[in-house]
Structure formats: C-alpha cells, structure tokens
Swiss-Prot record:
This is Small COPII coat GTPase SAR1B. GTP binds at N30, G32, K33, T34, T35, K131, D133, I172. Its EC number is 3.6.5.2. Gene3D superfamilies: P-loop containing nucleotide triphosphate hydrolases (3.40.50.300). SMART domains: ARF (SM00177), SAR (SM00178). It comes from Dictyostelium discoideum. Residues 10-14 are annotated as: Mediates recruitment to ER membranes. A motif (STAR) lies at residues 2-4. Belongs to the small GTPase superfamily. SAR1 family. It is found in: Endoplasmic reticulum membrane; Golgi apparatus, Golgi stack membrane; Cytoplasm, Cytosol.
Amino acid sequence: MFLVDWFYNMFLWLGFFKKEAKIVIIGLGNAGKTTLLHLLVTGSLKSHIPTLRPNAESFTYGNVNFKAYDLGGQQNLRFLWKQYVPDSKTIIVFMVDSSDYNSIIESKSEIHDILGDEHLSQSPLLILGSKCDAKGHHNRENLIDLLDIRRFELGLNNSNNVPFDLIMTSSITRYGITDMLNWLDKCTDIIKNN
C-alpha cells in the first residue's frame, strides 16, 4: 500500500492528474463572496450586484481543481446553503465582513447554526474575515471573540477531525488569499484521507 501511495503522490506532484474538491462560499450579503470568487477565477477585481441565484465557477490552485458555488446571502436565499453541502467532503467557506459589527453579530448566529447542525458540522469550515483592509475592521482575535468560536478547536488537524479555522482576507489587497488557498489545498488532502 505504501508503494501505491508513493507512486500516486509522485504522479500528483508531476501534475499527471489533479485532485477535485467542492467548496460552497456562503455568508451574509455584501461580505465579498462574489468578488472573491471572481478574483480566484480571473485574477482580477470587479464590482458585483447582489447574488440572486447560485453562481458556479471552477479554478485551479496547485494540483487541485476546485468547483466553487457562490450562494446569495440574503435572508430569503439562505435555505439554499444546506442543499449545496451534500456530504462531509464539501468545504464550507463562510465569509464575514470584518468591518461591519452588525454583520458579524448576525453571522455569529448563522455560523453557530452550521456548527450545531448534525449534517453541516461534519464538513470542513473555513471562516474568512473579509475586508480586513477596511478602516475599523476587527482583527482575527477580536473576530474569534465576537463570533464566539474560541471554544471550538481551530486548525486543520484538530481533535474533532473536521478542519475548522478563521483566516483574515482582503480581495482588494489580496491579503490572506494565499493562506486561504493553502488551507483549502491541505484540507483536500485531509478529506481524501478520512
């Protein structure tokens, strides 16, 4: 078995075939979900109107092909979130506008609903503190406290065996984007091995 894994990893490293992963990007309206996905797909920024229907795009990072679903954050569209997470191999990316206190408090409720849901809590969850370049944004430690997630073990390899973390990002300055992509890449390896 060791030899088979070694050859498989060698072929991956050489780029003969790529891993596949599915991510669902959710969060309240105006958190930057569509802007982030556009940046990941095209490498450029563009202004967007609120997302009214699911938007599917693909992008590649390293040797992983990601199929990403950007779902609207308006209250009347949130019922879709659960429908796009069919199994524990789907990575949930929850974006929180770190510069908007009211949005953070409302996001806290949605995040705790995910963490308390028997089905969704089995999927890896990456919270992105977006707009960390904006004046008055909350830093990572502050955001962890405001979202009341300190009691949960953060990290890729936590004792729950379900990757869960918070990374600060800015689509405008690209701060944290590489950290996010590296986390997603490593997460696909963990999912594959579970």
